[in-house]
Amino acid sequence: MTEKISILIVQSNPQVGNIDKNKQIVIDHIESNKSDLIIFSELMLTGYPPEDLVLKPAFMEKVNNAISDILNCSKNSNSTIIIGTPFLEESKLFNTALVIKKGKILHKHHKMALPNYGVFDEKRIFSNGEQVSIIEFNGIKLGLFICEDIWVNDT
């Protein structure tokens, strides 16, 4: 196990729908930091809540292009990156945390507890993830959760 791990938690204010600006925030942090682990927020690439924007194919194409750009940027970094993004898999749209290192997606955690009350209507847009994600990072087991996952008993 590593004795010391440096972790950067990025608290930014991503703009809903401004994928280019949000992606640039991510790339700037990857290029300028040497942290072992860089963690970005839920739905960092799209801003929160993206609502019906993620249902538009052209918007999701921009999201996928941004993910590709971030993967490419990560090739030159030793950091492991965790970033929130909408992610289409097997014809289902998920609110996902991607774990990225050296140009590869190492793991995907799909949010399990989708809120559907008050101003939140994630169940209308996203599919539920089905399992808790545990990853190994520098000899340490880490659980991945997205927002409401952490305080709902059945997740």
Please report, for each region that a protein language model flagged, where it lies by residue.
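Enzyme catalytic cores with a strong preference for nitrogen-chemistry domains
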Residues: 1-155
